[in-house]
Amino acid sequence: MTQVAKKILVTCALPYANGSIHLGHMLEHVQADIWVRYQRMRGNQVHFICADDAHGTPIMLKAQQMGIAPEDMIAAMSQEHQQDFAGFNISYDNYHSTHSEENRELSGLIYGRLKENGFIKNRTISQLYDPEKGMFLPDRFVKGTCPKCKAADQYGDNCEVCGATYSPTELIEPKSVVSGATPEMRDTEHFFFDLPAFSEMLQAWTRSGALQEQVANKMQEWFDSGLQQWDITRDAPYFGFEIPDAPGKYFYVWLDAPIGYMGSFKNLCDKRGDLNFDDFWKKDSDADLYHFIGKDIVYFHSLFWPAMLEGSGFRKPTNLFVHGYVTVNGAKMSKSRGTFIKAGTYLQHLDADCLRYYYAAKLSSRIDDIDLNLEDFVQRVNADIVNKVVNLASRNAGFINKRFDGKLADTLADAELYKTFTDAAASIAEAYSSRESGRAIREIMALADIANRYVDEQAPWVVAKAEGRDADLQAICSMGINLFRVLMTYLKPVLPSLAQRTEAFLNTELSWDAITTPLLNHQVSPFKALFNRIDLDKVNAMVDASKEDMVTTQKVVSGPLADNPVQDTINFDDFAKVDMRIALIKQAELVDGSDKLLRLTLDLGGETRQVFSGIREAYPDPAKLEGRLTVMVANLAPRKMRFGISEGMVMAAGPGGKDIFLLSPDSGAQPGMQVK
């Protein structure tokens, strides 16, 4: 049946650019990729895009901690994210960043239209301010008790327990996440998006079929509570886009983050030249727009985002496809247990198709959480992919290759059975289309059981030993391989790597529309192992490596220790040879002919030493050091220098130049005391 090709734009939520992709993230990207691959197999024009969410205070602060520019940090993180997604065969057409000129331009455009249309309000507000860090605190940098359900340790914008949204000033007993200080209130002028003006439109959109019923019901609770104007402003210092004509004020990350979908697509249009941005984003667009997101960001995508689009003259999403969280072994992902598994760590140990299959087998169109039970994961992948599907090919391919030079029979051994398999296409297609991949997998595996039962009943290994039955053997094995081909066609959206190897073996593309025509009198390639069983030891090694990731992460430092790592270990006897003493600086003077050295005269409590020290740049007025106690190495061999003999070494910290700091003992220490 010929169908009219649809124009479809698909997005996944933008990963935040301050951390690695983990298996929780991968659920969404795998779910979306399976749906996209299915749509492409059916001939639809699909553009699949994503980007890094690269703005906000967390990125600014983390870059500061690392001692690098935010731009450098997000560039490195983008490269890592794209490598992980490629490793899982996520078939993005474009992966961009919200920190882009396209996004800056579109954010300014949308803000300008909203302002022009009267949907931007400005007023002076009192906001929490960190007196220790000298900065206003964004909502995600304040934690306290939820004002609605009284759950502790909640962020300043929304409660992860009850889902309520509120302002940071409503938190009970707030604390700065940055310094731990109790914030104080200060006034600042902010810009607000008039969300309540869109209440009627949003309620109609909510019940238009654009949302899952669970999401629509949750939104009704928010409508019943009353919508509030949305603060879209953040004060400097902030890493993001400065608001036009408002120096020192920046767009809140959640304003420009969803606009990043548009920015990434605009970037794709500019690169390709044959795509028209307006065809997908103008108000009367006939293209479909789908956002795959997690349930934790429903509020932003179901209220703010469609209202922003409506108020600025753009189209709204066709659907939001919302999924639940990932647990591992029945519990929240845990770094200490090794179940907080990064995508990169997984790929070092296991085939991406394994996780894609397991997620697909559990996913539905509902918002239920998915549990990655690692033992069940091993058993299901081995039982289904290896024992049922791939084994079907290996049981038959050997006879075809050895006895018939890789040539399949010219007729089907059981046309009625084959039709049973191809007739299932409609039901499986409907399951994929409605994001019921778990149901699709169940139907495919039921067919796999039938196919293996056919081979068991026909027993080609017995037929192969009987004289004069070569034609029967070829027909039976060809039937088995044709059934394998149908199964792998159905599984192609889920298992792209295995599908590619299968296509090489079958010497044909796995095409949904081609399954009604069996492979007859067709040449296949010599059979090679298509898929390896999962060994539980590999899974355990991955878990152990994830624990090591946590230890490594905890040990990663920036600043002095990173710049000058701890040197090789010495034993106590070596350390005991160094005699450090408290010394009084009796005199400190410049050294003629040297721009680095000071001449120090030190009193060790009965003995005077002369020491030359390279601290002149840090202490340009050496007289200020006189009368100060310090620490010196007293048994260092005298060193003859151009300016005289140096009889020891004073202890100082820092990289050098102006950044060097002479060590001083605590009060009570006296010249001559040994430092132990």
Swiss-Prot record:
Example of a GO biological process term: methionyl-tRNA aminoacylation
The UniProt record lists the keyword Electron transport: no
EC class: ligase
Protein localization: Cytoplasm
Listed GO CC annotations: cytosol
Catalyzed reactions per annotation: tRNA(Met) + L-methionine + ATP = L-methionyl-tRNA(Met) + AMP + diphosphate
Binding site for Zn(2+): 146, 149, 159, 162
Keywords assigned: Aminoacyl-tRNA synthetase, ATP-binding, Cytoplasm, Ligase, Metal-binding, Nucleotide-binding, Protein biosynthesis, RNA-binding, tRNA-binding, Zinc
Cofactor binding remark: Binds 1 zinc ion per subunit.
Any GO MF annotation of the entry: metal ion binding
InterPro entries named among the record's database cross-references: aa-tRNA-synth_I_CS (IPR001412), Anticodon_Met (IPR041872), Met-tRNA-synth_bsu_C (IPR004495), Met-tRNA_ligase_1 (IPR023458), Met-tRNA_synth (IPR014758), Methionyl/Leucyl_tRNA_Synth (IPR015413), MetRS_core (IPR033911), MetRS_Zn (IPR029038)
Residues engaged in binding ATP: 335
Chain ranges of the tRNA-binding domain: 574-676
Record-linked HAMAP family: Met_tRNA_synth_type1 (MF_00098)
Function: Is required not only for elongation of protein synthesis but also for the initiation of all mRNA translation through initiator tRNA(fMet) aminoacylation.
NCBIfam families found in the cross-reference section: metG, metG_C_term, PRK00133.1
Subunit and partners: Homodimer.
Protein name: Methionine--tRNA ligase
Organism: Pectobacterium carotovorum subsp. carotovorum (strain PC1)
Lineage, uppermost ranks: Bacteria, Pseudomonadati, Pseudomonadota, Gammaproteobacteria, Enterobacterales
Gene that specifies this protein: metG
